[in-house]
Amino acid sequence: MSYLRTELHCHNLHSNDHLGDLEPPFDCDVSVQAQLEQSLKADLDVLFVTNHNTLDGYKQMLEYKRNHEKFSSLKVYPAEEVTTDKEAHVLVYGISEEIKSNQTLDEILDAARSQGAVTVAPHPFSLIDALREDSLKCDLFEVFNSSNIDIFSNKKAEIFAKEHHLDVIAG
């Protein structure tokens, strides 16, 4: 069996100004080029660009890759971090069209599944933008998020995942 070194939850500067109404407009200052360079440096095989409420950044990354051979070995797939009407977030992998934000969680999940996408509950117990128990509606569950500002959020996610026998990822 072989393993793929994969980044499942990351943003670039195209995520800016696409966040929810109650969130600050600035999310990330990493350019597409810098993100690709960092991915090569980390020896990644796969990258899912999960910008907030947009596929921008993914599209630009594909274009940049086409013009720069050194990134050809890195596989890049479409994804989006969608904001619900309650300002919680859902990761959606493998979509071809953006999913509209500010919908209910169930509406977002239906839209994702209509595209054959996989859904993930990111940072499910963070202090803000978390799905909490509604995470059970998603396909996968993020037990570690490097951006959580407290150590308890990841630990609580890990315990919750074990109690509910969830399939987990780290982002």
Predicted regions: what is each one?
Residues 6, 10-26, 58, 94-171:
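Domain-core and long-helix interface of multi-subunit machines
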Residues 88-91:
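Active-site segment of extracytoplasmic enzymes that catalyze sulfate/phosphate-ester chemistry
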Residues 1-86:
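An N-terminally biased module of ancient metal coordination in phosphate/nucleic-acid-related enzymes
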